[in-house]
């Protein structure tokens, strides 16, 4: 071997190592018996490329349609698409350690401290307790004037562009309305996007930050995250820090205010007085991180739901039925409030079916099987395996839902669940808000905002889809949240 140079020996060694890993992953790995596409079982490279392309949700859905409800999507990761997996992975089981979120997928914030999104069991409970009141029924009642204010302002702004004969790009308007609302609820002041008729730049930063996080994750998993400043596209550089800078600026202004503001921070600030010496509040760093999380979770998810509802109602000819329910329930617009819209069963069914076909958070970070391993869907899974449930994989599976590719709000009505063809639907597989102690804390707020805003729009306007300009709205990429394409709707003022 003396005639071989060191570079050649190094290259040969690398080839042998890669081949060994491929063979091991396919034939000797503890997960070798799980089905899945060959290249994905052999190497994590296809998974990483798919993550970077933003097509993970569609690829997982396709793999589940091919291989069934349990698919090996990386050498050390399994994706599920059934109701049992939600319970086995996410539900609290006495005496069993929690399946924590993958720390590689969700690293700590730039300041190195935790948030409600990335925290251990004890600290997550503390964060959730502090924010719990703001998302309770009592908290929602206190927040109703704020939610209604921005729904009404959206109606006012849309009157300016209605009846023109031209379709309106609604993603922008929904983003402005919900971002303003979540600004008021999060920091006690709006971002004034609707009043200025201009989307706040933080929204663009959020999307670019999440895309940069995906790139950083791939580099981190390869042990070369230090190359991120050199490999990150220019438009994404610094977006993570910029995202936190916005949160810092808004939080500082909020903390300068005295007395209750009727927002998410009232209880947190009281509990965190005197530098959080008692330990049951939050440190300043934790406040910053949670502020950034709340803005993303509270704005993008709700605006996505509104976009999905209006698109699917128009696309599948369900708009007339939804309009009839809303207009039949109210003699005047001022009768529309959070309590009254919660009594509209078809409107709620529309939201539920939208979240099945277009879940607000389509890509969730996997959980890590705790020490000692665990039983998932009747099979033992070794410790340190990554496991998760694919929303779209479960929701579009014909073995879970009849006519899974059709928008049928009726399937969510109480009586329909007992009748054909829906009585065999597996509703346990449908968990858009997740389950367990880490389910979405903002679920009630999201329902309230979507119900109220959608009801007001359907009461005031006749809405139809500009299919030629919109195309297939559901054909979108994701980087944690949807990279929404444009949604063009024709808006006409209702005739009385």
From Swiss-Prot:
Gene Ontology MF terms: heme binding; iron ion binding; monooxygenase activity; versicolorin B desaturase activity
Phenotype of null mutants: Impairs the production of sterigmatocystin and leads to the accumulation of dihydrosterigmatocystin.
Q: How does it sit in the membrane?
A: Single-pass membrane protein
Q: What is its EC number?
A: 1.14.19.n5
Q: Which residues bind heme?
A: 440
Q: Which Gene3D superfamilies match?
A: Cytochrome P450
What keywords does the record list, in alphabetical order?
A: Heme, Iron, Membrane, Metal-binding, Monooxygenase, NADP, Oxidoreductase, Transmembrane, Transmembrane helix
Under what conditions is it induced?
A: The genes forming the sterigmatocystin biosynthesis cluster are co-regulated and induced on oatmeal porridge or the fungal isolates were grown either on oatmeal porridge or in YEC medium (0.2% yeast extract, 5.0% corn steep liquor). Expression is positively regulated by the cluster-specific transcription factor aflR that binds the palindromic sequence 5'-TCG(N5)CGA-3'found in the promoter.
Cofactor(s) annotated in UniProt: heme
Of the GO CC terms on this record, one is: membrane
- Kindly list the places in or outside the cell where this protein is found, as annotated in its UniProt entry: Membrane
User: Which reaction does this enzyme catalyse, per its entry?
Assistant: versicolorin B + NADPH + O2 + H(+) = versicolorin A + NADP(+) + 2 H2O
Q: Which residues cross the membrane?
A: 3-23
Q: What class of enzyme is it?
A: oxidoreductase
Q: Which PROSITE patterns match?
A: CYTOCHROME_P450
Can you tell which superkingdom this protein's organism belongs to?
A: Eukaryota
User: Its GO biological process terms?
Assistant: sterigmatocystin biosynthetic process
Q: In which pathway does it act?
A: Mycotoxin biosynthesis; sterigmatocystin biosynthesis
Q: Which family does it belong to?
A: Belongs to the cytochrome P450 family.
Reported function:
Cytochrome P450 monooxygenase; part of the gene cluster that mediates the biosynthesis of sterigmatocystin (ST), a polyketide-derived furanocoumarin which is part of the most toxic and carcinogenic compounds among the known mycotoxins. The first step in the biosynthesis of sterigmatocystin is the production of hexanoate by the fatty acid synthase (FAS) units stcJ and stcK. The polyketide backbone is assembled by the non-reducing polyketide synthase stcA by condensation of the starter hexanoyl-CoA and 7 malonyl-CoA extender units followed by cyclization and release of norsolorinic acid.
| Name of the protein this chain belongs to | Versicolorin B desaturase stcL
What's the source species for this entry? Emericella nidulans (strain FGSC A4 / ATCC 38163 / CBS 112.46 / NRRL 194 / M139) (Aspergillus nidulans)
Quick one: which gene encodes this? Answer: stcL
